[in-house]
Amino acid sequence: MTVEGVADRRTAPSARYQPVLGTLGFVWDQAADQVLLIHRTRRADGKHNGLGGKLEPDEDIVTGMARELHEEAAIVPTDMRLRGTISWPGFEGPDGDDWFGFLFLITRWTGEIPDSNDEGELSWVPRSRLMAWCDPATRSDSGLDLHEGDVHFLPLLFDDDPRPFHALMPWEQGRPTGWSVTRV
């Protein structure tokens, strides 16, 4: 299958898709209907995002997500569900590093969440504000700055469909160039 914007980058017959494996988790306080976001002020683009990062060689995705939650928010998840996966070819870096992410929704945890960490500031955002960012008509009113492609998957994280989603979102020159998703 050829995906626009991806095939052009891989002209060498020996080129293989060997993405960075990562986790991305959204901590949801259901009682308050708020989602924990980090404003990654350490990075030049300073985006708001869920918590997560690269898997270590000795980790499975659950262990890696739990480690990232502890490192970034000082919490231990007690209810964590894999909601989906996304392949992000060309996502990050000057050469467009490929990423493959495992997306989690965390609804119970132990620990006290600090106001910040080495990556940036942590804050609780009403889920309605996060969903407002996903709507082009209300995006500017949300006061959030997320990655442009997040508009596609954020609603899937919080919907009632129990099936995980599996998506492809190619990137080129710092912007998403496509989106396809399947649920099984």
Say what each PLM segment does:
Residues 32, 43-44, 88, 107-112, ...:
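Short, charged/polar surface micro-motifs in flexible loops or helix N-caps
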Residues 48-50, 55, 113, 169:
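Short clusters of hydrophobic/aromatic residues that line enzyme substrate/ligand-binding pockets
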Residues 38, 114-117, 165-168:
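Short, hydrophobic secondary-structure boundary micro-motifs
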Residues 2-50, 77, 81:
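N-terminal strand-loop-strand
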Residues 155-184:
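Charged phosphate-binding loop/patch that engages nucleotide di/tri-phosphates or the phosphate backbone
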